[in-house]
């Protein structure tokens, strides 16, 4: 089998909160850390470099903020463990009923065919967890712990 088109990871979900609240949940690490990473070095600001950490796994990602359009779009490049950066775009579509449809797309995966497919599938699963955690937290104030619980033995302590 030959890959003729590099895969793109995409996840999307309706969040039953106004767009400003949903958008801010990704800009402010004090909020994002309730449903995704455990620590962020600062708010997302265009041209800034930010570090996100998943302390339970001992991993982090360096994030370069490329574009922010308030309540509409976030564009970053990121890499973990010194890997080649990929591009992640969040799109926020407000709806008439004061809900928000969020779409996250990651592109730019590199490696051989098997590796690119593995990375894209993993990313899509991760962003699906992310949106599920966001939904539970913003709509019901419940922290599902999805990042930690999807791989409870990944820290090597159990």
What is each residue range found by the language model?
Residues 34, 39-80:
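Glycine-rich portal/gate segments that line the openings of hydrophobic small-molecule binding cavities
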Residues 13, 62-67, 87-94:
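Hydrophobic/aromatic beta-strand elements that line small-molecule binding cavities or substrate pockets
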Residues 136-158:
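Short, highly charged C-terminal tails/helix-capping segments
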Residues 27-28, 70, 132, 139-140:
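Residues at helix-coil transition
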